[in-house]
Amino acid sequence: MRSLLVFRKIPSRIRLRNLRNNKPFCSQSQFPKESENPSQEQRLLVYGSTSEENPVTSKVSLLSAKPEQKDDASVIDVLLNRRNNPEAALRFYNWARPWRGSFEDGDVFWVLIHILVSSPETYGRASDLLIRYVSTSNPTPMASVLVSKLVDSAKSFGFEVNSRAFNYLLNAYSKDRQTDHAVDIVNQMLELDVIPFFPYVNRTLSALVQRNSLTEAKELYSRMVAIGVDGDNVTTQLLMRASLREEKPAEALEVLSRAIERGAEPDSLLYSLAVQACCKTLDLAMANSLLREMKEKKLCVPSQETYTSVILASVKQGNMDDAIRLKDEMLSDGISMNVVAATSLITGHCKNNDLVSALVLFDKMEKEGPSPNSVTFSVLIEWFRKNGEMEKALEFYKKMEVLGLTPSVFHVHTIIQGWLKGQKHEEALKLFDESFETGLANVFVCNTILSWLCKQGKTDEATELLSKMESRGIGPNVVSYNNVMLGHCRQKNMDLARIVFSNILEKGLKPNNYTYSILIDGCFRNHDEQNALEVVNHMTSSNIEVNGVVYQTIINGLCKVGQTSKARELLANMIEEKRLCVSCMSYNSIIDGFFKEGEMDSAVAAYEEMCGNGISPNVITYTSLMNGLCKNNRMDQALEMRDEMKNKGVKLDIPAYGALIDGFCKRSNMESASALFSELLEEGLNPSQPIYNSLISGFRNLGNMVAALDLYKKMLKDGLRCDLGTYTTLIDGLLKDGNLILASELYTEMQAVGLVPDEIIYTVIVNGLSKKGQFVKVVKMFEEMKKNNVTPNVLIYNAVIAGHYREGNLDEAFRLHDEMLDKGILPDGATFDILVSGQVGNLQPVRAASL
């Protein structure tokens, strides 16, 4: 329902006219001093006429009255008598204002506004008066108060309310950047069915968008649409920008679509915004279509920004052909390529592994422009790092300085990461020291070095770096201390780890869940369950919520210290109290814990509970179960698990195949083991060293050294290194086969690749040589053991003692017996049998009896 007030119909757009002879307000009158007998000039100035018969003759006394006698009512009477002559009314207002003072608080000002907006000749003056009033008032008057004054003065003095007065008031607020008041004015105008001028509304919408009051801008527009006011292209543009700022490109396109349905003709700016919206939705077909449409309609050549948007989207979608075509099209239109588009193209080339094209474009940028910026260098340096081309990365890093670009923390960190990954530790530390000295390294870079130092076991150097950071004003954060604390825990130095934890508290930093997880895990790794649980108590007493990471650490730790039942109980409590979103990781720890404790039935029960709780087992779950079942001679169940994995679409990985193959090899079922090995290869998996070792051991146990050696050769061909276990198994089998030459060659090869013989391989060789009567070589091995500080075990001593017995060297045999005792190695029954039989056979019953 429309307001009872009558509003004058006015054009939706106007051109404000400048005030002629516009002078600023001042404290002195701009008119001649009044006299007892006003001159013709005074009458003309005040009344607009020299006639004594002026319609307001009754008010002539006003000119000669004392200032204090000039009240608002008298001024209003004169103004009302000049309502048909707005310019005369304004002259009188300006004349009376110095005598009376400010009229803005009363009705005088608003009566004048109504008079001025009634004539096109004084529109501009009305607007200027309102602008001055709003901008000079302190505090800024409330919009609702001024609207009320407009409406009330119209009713009181018989004016038809002109919507122009409201719009000029809106203009005054929007020009003074009083956006909230401007919004209030629009809302009140809409309530009064007054149609706002769109240039003024657009200015208000623009202010709302600029300050990110996007929802408020949309709501204001919606209220206008509700009364049938749609706005113009500028309005549509502002609303599209609001949607794009909110990352709602589909909404922006919908705004444009509705505008077109209402008959709007999109201009070049709306096309550009539509292209940007399509790029954000990666609808490149539509974006390219809009570009063509812009050209066909000859609105304008797409701008650099528009072309850049489509190029960026094409690169993001991996469509480099389109991106390059658009770049060429842009250049042919006479539009230069900016650094954003050029850098995006370099990024695309790098992603396509086309480094040549990337560097060609970079060289062109250096020669012809646009000049590469820091982001351009970042893309290339990061690409070089990922591909291990660190010398090239360093070259571009130095080139930045030549071009006057200051490397950032990102560049330093990227190169340091690359050096560390490539095991170029000295280069990494050198660059770090340089950046640290120049102040370029921040806590982020320092934390990377701290982490690396601690992984290398260099916790002393890490601790020293913490001190240097503080002295340089680089405050270590919780991550810094976490790195050092983790380093101490890895070295099982829990006392130092606790000192670091205390430092965190002393520095006023707040330990996070990861901090506590490090300490808890460190305690469990040291089999210190009590202190681990004390750390948990410290968390709860400090009102720190224990999250899933910490709970998982506790469960995993309990399983490691043989408290798997307690871990399962904790898990059950957490599920009941809904304190943890249980994953298969928790159950995996429990299943593995039960297996290591020999509780296979409990492990299977935990698996069944896991499935009952709706948690899907993963490959780790199945591998743990199959490994345990195989080691407990339950191959049928292990194969059932394998079949279940396949039925559920869980692919076997190398550890899973390894568990089954090892199980079959230990049972000498080499046919099944070989079948699984073939299946593994068909799946495209690469066998691991443990799998090869299991197969070699299996064939060795069957005496099939040909097959064992074939696997050894394949292992080397696949690029895998043999470990001590591999060589021990092969040498043992070859010695049993009597192939001493090949066994000796493998032993030499083993030492050549840097493997140091241990007690086990010495035992195998000594026993093998002893059984073949190679006593001289046995003694040689025995001496080599001592030289390498490997203590012979009782089996080796027995073999050497037996050899001396067979050689008739009983004194040396007894000396070795005494040596065993001196080294704390207890002789076994075989030792005594050798020595006793030797004494009796040599008619030394007394010595034999003493044994």
UniProtKB/Swiss-Prot annotation:
Top-level taxon in the UniProt lineage: Eukaryota
One Pfam family of this chain: PPR_2
Tagged with keyword Repeat: yes
Transit peptide: 1-26
UniProt xrefs under NCBIfam families: PPR (TIGR00756)
Family: Belongs to the PPR family. P subfamily.
Protein name in the entry: Pentatricopeptide repeat-containing protein At3g54980, mitochondrial
Organism the protein comes from: Arabidopsis thaliana
